[in-house]
Every structure is written in structure tokens, then in C-alpha cells.
């Protein structure tokens, strides 16, 4: 998981002309990287703990989109994410917005729009597993980035499910109508 998130952060750190201040971009990349490191450092939550967790919880975190197999990413975007997990109903929902990044080596700037989770389920593979679709449209710097196919799989981490991580290394976006393969990673902490 850390590698997928690192790709988007590296793509952002190497950007050139920017409509945002260097400090704003540095802060987002740092927050993203720090949250990723914290979640990656936690052990997998046991299925018994997830099954016994009552009620609902809100997780705050980040969603990153990037092209991990290229020297210079064509897409490198990071957004803030809010997720709601209902442990009783075995569902997860949420959205990512407030994206910052670059597309096709363009300027680093804010991207409007949001990406939304759909069909979010807990316990599909094991009691600890998470699955969800994600789609939506982001616009900025004259570009339209439409996430058309992301099937996220993940897990809870930490002794009391204080974190979660989901990834799709084979997601599809359309950038100004052209198909691009990207990796999508979602992390959250409560």
C-alpha cells in the first residue's frame, strides 16, 4: 500500500510551475505521507475484533491517484477523504475531494469535483476485508479526469480497527477523454 501512495506523493513533489504556493503543496504531500506511514505501521486488525466492533465510525484520510510504472506520472493527484464505516450493517461509504496535483506535467493546482465510494462492503473475503467501487470527475488546469473504473480492496489495521487501507493497482481514468491506467489508494484513520 505504501508504494502506491508514495507514487502519487513523488509525482506531486516533482512538479514544476504551480498555481499553489510551494508550502501548500508541501503540506499536502507531507500529511499524505505521514498518514500513509502511520497506517502502514499498524498490524492487520483481527477478524474477531472487526466482527465485535459496535456502531459506526468516521475515518479521515487521503485518496491518491497515480501512474506507478512511469518515470514521470501522467496523473498525480491527492485528495482529502472522509469515510463512514457502519460495523453493524457491514458497509462503508465516503468521498474524496479537495484534490491537489498535476496531469500530463501541467501546473500543480487544485482540482474541483469529488470521487465517491459505491457498493462499499465489509467482510466480503474475511471479516476484516473491505471492498468498494470508486468513481467521479475532477477538473483543474483545463483538464478533466474521470475515474471510471476502480475496484478497491483493503483491510482494517490496528488493534481496534483505528485505520484502514484500500487499493486498486489497475484502475482506469479518462483524462480529457483518453484512457489511462492508474493506481488508486485510500487510507483513513479514526
Protein language model features and the residues they cover:
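Mature soluble binding/inhibitory domains
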Residues: 15-190
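Sec-dependent bacterial lipoprotein signal peptides
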Residues: 1-15
Amino acid at each position: 500500500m505504501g508504494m502506491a501512495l508514495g507514487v502519487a506523493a513523488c509525482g506531486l513533489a516533482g512538479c514544476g510551475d504551480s498555481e499553489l504556493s510551494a508550502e501548500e503543496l508541501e503540506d499536502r504531500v507531507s500529511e499524505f505521507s505521514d498518514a500513509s506511514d502511520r497506517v502502514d505501521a499498524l498490524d492487520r486488525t483481527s477478524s474477531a475484533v472487526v466482527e465485535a466492533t459496535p456502531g459506526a465510525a468516521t475515518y479521515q484520510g487521503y485518496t491518491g491517484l497515480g501512474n506507478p510504472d512511469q518515470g514521470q506520472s501522467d496523473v498525480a493527484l491527492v485528495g482529502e477523504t472522509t469515510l463512514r464505516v457502519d460495523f453493524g450493517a457491514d458497509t462503508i461509504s465516503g468521498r474524496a475531494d479537495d484534490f491537489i496535483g498535476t496531469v500530463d506535467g501541467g501546473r500543480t493546482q487544485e482540482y474541483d469535483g469529488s470521487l465517491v465510494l459505491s457498493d462499499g462492503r465489509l467482510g466480503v473475503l474475511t471479516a476484516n476485508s473491505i471492498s468498494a467501487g470508486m468513481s467521479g470527475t475532477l477538473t483543474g488546469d483545463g483538464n478533466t479526469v474521470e475515474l471510471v473504473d476502480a475496484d478497491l480492496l483493503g483491510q482494517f489495521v490496528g488493534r481496534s480497527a483505528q485505520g484502514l487501507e484500500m487499493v486498486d493497482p489497475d484502475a482506469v481514468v479518462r483524462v480529457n477523454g483518453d484512457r489511462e491506467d492508474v493506481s488508486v489508494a485510500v487510507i483513513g484513520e479514526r
